[in-house]
Amino acid sequence: MRKTSSFERSGRVAPVYRGEKRKTSGPLAVRLIMTAATTLGCALSGWSQAAPQLPDDNGKETVQKACASCHSLATVINAGHNQQGWNSVVHMMVNAGAPVPKEQMATVIEYLTKYFPEKPAPEAVVIPGSVEVSIKEWQVPTPGSRPHDPAYAPDGSVWYTGQMANVLGRFDPETDQFKEYPLKTPDSGPHGLLPDKDGNIWFTANFKAYIGKLDPKTGDVTEYPMPDSRARDPHTLIFAPNGNIYFTVQGGNMVGRLNPKTGEVKVVSSPTPKSNPYGMAVNSKGIPFFVEFGSNKVASLDPDTLSIHEYVLPHVDSRPRRVAITPDDAIWYTDYSRGYLGRLDSATGKVSEWASPGGPRSRPYGITAVDDMLWYSESNTRPNTVVRFDPKTEKFQTWIIPSGGGVVRNMVHTPEGNLWLACSGVNGIAFVEVKNAAKISSRN
């Protein structure tokens, strides 16, 4: 049964789905399985073990050179976009330093569109349950900004990284007003972000190799450059209880630490080559954990020495992308390549897995933990879904994102247990209000 809620999206009523299990499909405003340039460049290189060959045609040599500068050509073979999608991906690659001459970009886009077209996406699967939610969405002010990550600030505002517009955005849910803050370095590619207790917003400049701090009161941005030229693309960042910021460097294959008091930045390489450190979270003991999107591994980082301990996941094709930690210090990750939700017990190394409702091509992505409940997105279903998993009952419940989502890359929760999503491909943000479930905040 399909019901509608009373919320509005751009002046229109948007649906909330409840009732019996059903499959639903619908057009997306923009269908981009778009990644930050280094994500396209590095993340999926392990999916195909065979050495692929590109078709002979104009653009082949440039594609081969540009893609091989960061990743296996299997990435291109496994990818698929329409012309608009490849246009966005190629521009992101160039922003991140891929060697594609400006005069050859049109040829490269035409080549990729011709030989690696968009692939059919799996239909979203709606699983009913007892929890009720409503979903409200907003378009961000700058077209084509592609919000990548959201963050919830102590004053109740919601922030997002406008990655392709070179802005940080602030949204006030009380007034429905947006304000965007331009960054001083062009094409910084803001990616991850988080607020501090003083109201500053810290972010990673994925295209320009620095971590930034925005003072919303003045608009001033302080930049902390990476100390190693290989650390070209800082990705996800977190605060630890000791006050330091820890972060991943995806294509640079590193993780690092920034001391906000001194400005000192240190980076170390991942033990596994091309492991592409991606999502990161911190446990109750103050130990950062991160997932390796280029390998089948989860890793912990000693906050003092920066030594790394890796945990090998049982399936060789696993590619964990984002991570969340529940109060029992269980490590939960979205297995993007296989369509699974995974749980790692770091004390024993035991791994448990559950197939995501949307199937092996659903591409689970952004994830957060609200107390012991897991919430995540399926980024490749049509439309995208919000998924809730109860570890005690091992049951899923899912909801469709009315706009389609257009690849929900990350999500955060509020102290009340509601969710904010960054809907990259449809250029928006979304609020998921959880109406009738226990909503206890987990650690940030």
What is the predicted role of each segment?
Residues 172-176, 215-219, 259-263, 302-306, ...:
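Short loop/turn segments that connect beta-strands within beta-propeller blades
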Residues 46-62:
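Electrostatic cytochrome c docking/interface patches
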Residues 96-124, 199, 417-419:
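C-terminal capping alpha-helices of c-type cytochrome domains
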Residues 406-444:
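Blade-level signature of beta-propeller repeat domains, shared across WD40, Kelch, NHL, RCC1
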Residues 126-144:
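A short helix->beta-strand "capping" segment at the edge of beta-propeller domains
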Residues 64-74, 108, 112:
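The canonical Cys-X-X-Cys-His
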Residues 143-155, 186-198, 229-242, 272-288, ...:
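Beta-rich, blade/repeat-based domains predominating
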Residues 158-164, 201-207, 245-251, 288-294, ...:
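Conserved beta-strand positions in repeat-built beta-propeller and related beta-rich domains
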